[in-house]
Amino acid sequence: MRLILWLPVLVVVLLMVTEGPAPAQGAPDVASTFRNIPNSLKEFGNNLKDTFESIPEATRKLMTSFAERLKNFRIPLL
């Protein structure tokens, strides 16, 4: 019974061992990383600007929908 339970574990361990080491990752090019930082910051700034510019319009739409709901809201009398 123990052999039957240990057999799948043994198979998995053997597969892991025969797979070998993982391939090494290439070293990153530091110079290109530093060259891309200004572009990344500019893109981030533009995205942030677009997001903040859309906030007033989204707030206006939300408040308008609340005002419409309140206009049609009636308190039931007891």
Curated annotation (Swiss-Prot):
Q: Where is the signal peptide?
A: 1-26
Q: Which GO terms describe its molecular function?
A: fatty acid binding; phospholipase inhibitor activity
Q: Key word Transport present in the record?
A: yes
From the Swiss-Prot or TrEMBL record, state where the protein is found. Secreted
Family matches, as InterPro entries: ApoC-I
- The question of whether Secreted is a record keyword is answered with yes
Q: Which residues cross the membrane?
A: none
Query: Cellular component terms, GO, for this chain's entry?
Result: high-density lipoprotein particle; very-low-density lipoprotein particle
Q: Which UniProt keywords apply?
A: Lipid transport, Secreted, Signal, Transport, VLDL
Q: Name one GO biological process term.
A: triglyceride metabolic process
Q: Which PANTHER family match?
A: APOLIPOPROTEIN C-I
Q: Which family does it belong to?
A: Belongs to the apolipoprotein C1 family.
**Protein name, entry field:** Apolipoprotein C-I
The source organism is: Panthera tigris altaica (Siberian tiger)
The gene it comes from is APOC1
